[in-house]
Swiss-Prot record:
Species the sequence originates in: Geobacillus sp. (strain WCH70)
InterPro entries: ATP_syn_F0_a_bact/chloroplast, ATP_synth_F0_asu, ATP_synth_F0_asu_AS, F0_ATP_A_sf
Biological function: Key component of the proton channel; it plays a direct role in the translocation of protons across the membrane.
Molecular function GO labels: proton-transporting ATP synthase activity, rotational mechanism
Membrane-topology annotation of the record: Multi-pass membrane protein
Subunit structure: F-type ATPases have 2 components, CF(1) - the catalytic core - and CF(0) - the membrane proton channel. CF(1) has five subunits: alpha(3), beta(3), gamma(1), delta(1), epsilon(1). CF(0) has three main subunits: a(1), b(2) and c(9-12). The alpha and beta chains form an alternating ring which encloses part of the gamma chain. CF(1) is attached to CF(0) by a central stalk formed by the gamma and epsilon chains, while a peripheral stalk is formed by the delta and b chains.
Protein name as catalogued: ATP synthase subunit a
The gene coding this protein: atpB
Length: 236
């Protein structure tokens, strides 16, 4: 179901207040998780510390599968931040949505292409930055004309394609999930018959959406490290 976004103009710029609200809430939740997991560290981790250490090892495995740890270790915190932030963002719109005066205030921030494409642009821009920083501009530039200079236009197109697919893949999966949940929720509100018919599919789809949200967070982080490896590793 389509609802208008709460827009606000400031200094000639238009802001989506729902996006501002939801990315702020996502950031706060991730921050709270990080603080709770590291507040009372022990040699025998339990609870939240155990979870965070699992995330640390999981992201480390992603990085080491794409580049050597000496090079990739500097991206460890980036990978952890991305996978946790995107997973939490993907989950926020699953339990419910909040619509006030026809404006959608509560949703998954990753169900908006502006957010996902911004994340994708940030990741691709960082890959170019570190490519120049770690390899030097000359070696970095050679990557666009090797093995043949005639491939240069295709390499440029590839960079734009990588950015678009990285952002739109995440957006498409999360947005489609929320649309279907909204349709199923509409079935729940059509009476006893609609409730009985829709309740099992709704629960099943919410469970599947949790799985999809986790997979999309993993894919985004994995592709981030793939793009980083292509720019910073000499063997790519």
């Amino acid at each position: 179901m389509h609802h208008e976004a709460p827009l606000y103009e400031f200094l000639g710029l238009t802001f989506n207040l729902a996006n501002v609200l939801m990315i702020t809430i996502t950031s706060v939740i991730v921050f709270i998780i990080a603080v709770a997991a590291t507040r009372n560290l022990s040699m025998k981790p339990t609870g939240m510390q155990n979870f965070l250490e699992w995330v640390v090892d999981f992201v480390k495995g992603i990085i080491k599968s794409n580049m050597d740890w000496k090079t990739g270790g500097r991206f460890h915190l980036l990978g952890m931040t991305l996978i946790m932030y995107i997973f939490v963002a993907n989950m926020l719109g699953l339990p419910f949505s909040i619509v006030i005066d026809g404006k959608l205030w509560w949703k998954s921030p990753t169900a908006d292409p502006v957010i996902t494409l911004t994340l994708a642009i940030m990741v691709v821009a960082l890959s170019h930055y570190y490519g120049i920083k770690l390899r030097g501009f000359q070696e970095y530039a050679k990557g666009f004309v090797s093995p043949m200079w005639i491939l240069f236009p295709l390499k440029i197109i590839e960079e734009f394609a990588n950015t678009l697919t990285l952002g739109l893949r995440l957006y498409g999966n999360i947005y489609a999930g929320e649309i279907l949940l909204a349709l199923l929720a509409g079935g729940l509100a059509t009476g006893v018959g609609g409730t009985i018919a829709a309740i099992i599919p709704t629960i099943a789809w919410q469970a599947f959406s949790i799985f999809v949200g986790a997979i999309q967070a993993f894919i985004f982080t994995m592709l981030t490290m793939v793009y980083m490896a292509h720019k910073v590793s000499h063997d790519h």
